[in-house]
Amino acid sequence: MKTNKYLFIFAFILFSAQNILAQETKINKTSFDLINLDYKGLEKVKALVTAKKYEDASEQLLKYYRGRTDVKNLDFNNTDRQKYAGKKVSDNTLELANDILLHKFKPHKGYPAYDYGKDINWQYRPVQDQLLTTFLHRTAFWEPLGIVYNSTGNETYAKEWVFEVRDWIQKNKQGAYPDDKQYAWKAFVVSFRLNHWSSYFNMFINSPHFTPAFLMEFLNSYKEQADYVMNNYTDIGNHRLYEALHMMYAGSSFPEMNHAETWRKSGITVLNDEIKKQVLPDGVQFELSPSYHIGTIKIFLDALQIAQLNGVEKEFPESYHNLVEKMILAVGKYSFPDYTFPLYGNSFLTTKSAMLKNYQVWTKVFPQNKTIEYYAADGKSGLKPEYLSSSLPNAGFYAFRNGWDTTSTVMQIKAGPPAGFHSQPDNGNFVLWVKDRDFTPDAGSFVYANVGNQENSKRDWYRSTKAHQTLTLDDQNIQNDAKLIKWQPDGNLQLLSYLNPSYKNLNHERNFLFVDKTFFIIIDRAIGTAKGDLAIHYNLKEDSKASINSLNNSIVTNYSDGNNLVIQLLNKDKVTLKEESSFVSYQYQKETNRPAFVFKKPKNNELTQGFISILYPYNCNKPPEIKIIENKGHDLSNGKIDLTLTINGKINQIQQNLNP
């Protein structure tokens, strides 16, 4: 059966590529308009162009590129093929490459490979997710062809790549279809294509199927695309950063082109400008997404590396370096001891190994920073931070913690300003991590792109306020614009207090108390004239086997290892406790059901209503006995907290004035 499969593949390739020579574009003088013929090393090319021997000139130009070693690509260089030659590739990579031969493409890992047809239909949209189509036009899915080609030397893979590049160029000219600026000619997408194509150029340059005619077609298309990005930068956000970085890639990958220096300088100018706009004073990128924050660090550092390769590092000022260093330190503040972080703002779950690799790159850039070294060495060298609880006040990221190792208790909290596209209406949301367990993971995003103006119910649910650990009115989404009231990160009674204008005529004041560096009390106040059903939501880890006790309004996890959590409402007024539907998504297009619960009470008048919750981690299979006495001075509606809290016989006096 496998033999028949490969016979079919090669028959398919012969059919697809039978007209490849007929596609060869006639080479003339204008073919060289994009080349700086005075560039060092192109003397023979210039002489042949001057002599009007254009075919010979293109052959000489190809010879130049095949022998070029002074231009370095961050991903794949001409000389790298020696590392791949004869090296066994993974079964998955080989399968992907062979599928590409059949025009079965897998642009995004969240979806299977789809058949785009013998006559490739670049407009085929098999699912209602615009991300899949934009990833198709980034063309990163071609990489397995290059890897397998450089491993095996089998020209079938190179021939198919040349064919598909030509097919893409022919069928995706600007204006070829009405919404091309949302897909193939979206500047953000084009910029990624430039980046990938510069690597593929090196992967396939030595193939006999990479002809002089194809070289000129490739370079002319590359020039058109780079000029397009430079003239169509996205106005704001991480897209603009990626576009600028990829313009630097373009300029450094093909310095022989007339516009190369303009492209490179354009990228540097944008990055120098945008780092001041997009990075808040506390070091967090302004879209407030932990994953995208790390992505922007890579953008800024890749730009520095490209500048170093081109001898123009000084075009990035010291302030640029300092901000990137601050960005790296911010990652440690919003992370847990296992190097993961909350999935705020369309983030997806990372791994410790991935983050250690990041830190090992970062510590080489900032070798004098002992805190970055500490993270990079997994605590074996360097210096751990001098603080425990910490804040990133401009982003509204706060962390209570009692240590830096995996036996620690850490609560990460989001209470920030309005943010960009990736931000979700989730102020007040928190993630509680105790002894290497994330008890209340953020929901994640599952999917974060719609198709045009079409709604996506999954995207809407994952973005919704009720999917997060915070307060809602009638389960509607809130607006984010938190204002800090008080932050006290030291001592045995630590406090975070903020006010958020969640709804029209309803402000949400949330107060987090970290008691004895052991447990938490959350005090919510709904202030304003709005009426409706108030609720506070608790979404727990999918394997927690959580259960409820309606008699004392408590939720308990049931882990067999004894590392458990009880959440109990301490209100004396009538509150209902119910289970609700919830999910968590750690990877794109993958989700898991999880236990979730909601405490509800009506707000029928203008009086302030409140909730008082305790989150108590414990180390056995029996939850602690928690009792509360409201003392005479206790008046939640007026911001006066005076409670006597008894936990397994230990008495805690909790007194706090919540008024500014």
Segments from the language model and where they lie:
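Bacterial Sec-dependent N-terminal signal peptides
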Residues: 1-24
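Cytochrome P450 core scaffold surrounding the K-helix E-X-X-R motif
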Residues: 440-443, 449-452
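Short alpha-helical hairpin
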Residues: 103-123, 135-136
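Residue-level structural signal for beta-strand termini and adjacent loop
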Residues: 444-445, 657
